[in-house]
Amino acid sequence: MQVILLDKVVHLGNIGDQVNVKSGFARNFLIPQGKAVMATKANIEYFEARRAELEAKAAEVLAAAQARAAKLAELGSVTIASKAGDEGRLFGSITTRDVADAVTAAGVEVAKSEVRLSTGPIRTLGDHEVKFQLHGEVFATINVIVVAE
């Protein structure tokens, strides 16, 4: 199925590219999320008329993500208190939601879907490096310090 990309899609293409994808991927992911439209003659003409507007919008979103990444770098680290046993193991774990809530409380708005815990949930006390993917190509890293309550 031929589609026109309205946004940059990782491993697929940039704004305005006409790509051939499986119909299920187009119908269930790209089109509902507004990342692509079917490549009909009318849509091609419509897209060419709006190309500059869509590229400006994409640049604006990228600039906003870079500004948030700079704020995260400025923040540096976040402390999360959790109940823990004597050996330094937590009762429960620190998940992406907990990290996102702590960073948001510290003053930088992030969603839990933007948090990347490389080794899964945090289960021990101490310093842990957490990555954030704020945009397709904008990443930030902060240090999460887990302390016992």
From Swiss-Prot:
One of its GO terms (molecular function) is structural constituent of ribosome. InterPro entries: Ribosomal_bL9 (IPR000244), Ribosomal_bL9/RNase_H1_N (IPR009027), Ribosomal_bL9_bac/chp (IPR020594), Ribosomal_bL9_C (IPR020069), Ribosomal_bL9_C_sf (IPR036791), Ribosomal_bL9_N (IPR020070), Ribosomal_bL9_N_sf (IPR036935). The keyword Glycosyltransferase does not apply. SUPFAM superfamilies: L9 N-domain-like, Ribosomal protein L9 C-domain. Signal peptide: none annotated. Keywords: Ribonucleoprotein, Ribosomal protein, RNA-binding, rRNA-binding. Disulfide bonds: none annotated. It holds the Pfam family Ribosomal_L9_C. One of its GO terms (biological process) is translation. GO terms for cellular component: ribonucleoprotein complex; ribosome. PROSITE patterns: RIBOSOMAL_L9. Binds to the 23S rRNA. Belongs to the bacterial ribosomal protein bL9 family. PANTHER family: 50S RIBOSOMAL PROTEIN L9. This is Large ribosomal subunit protein bL9. The gene is rplI.
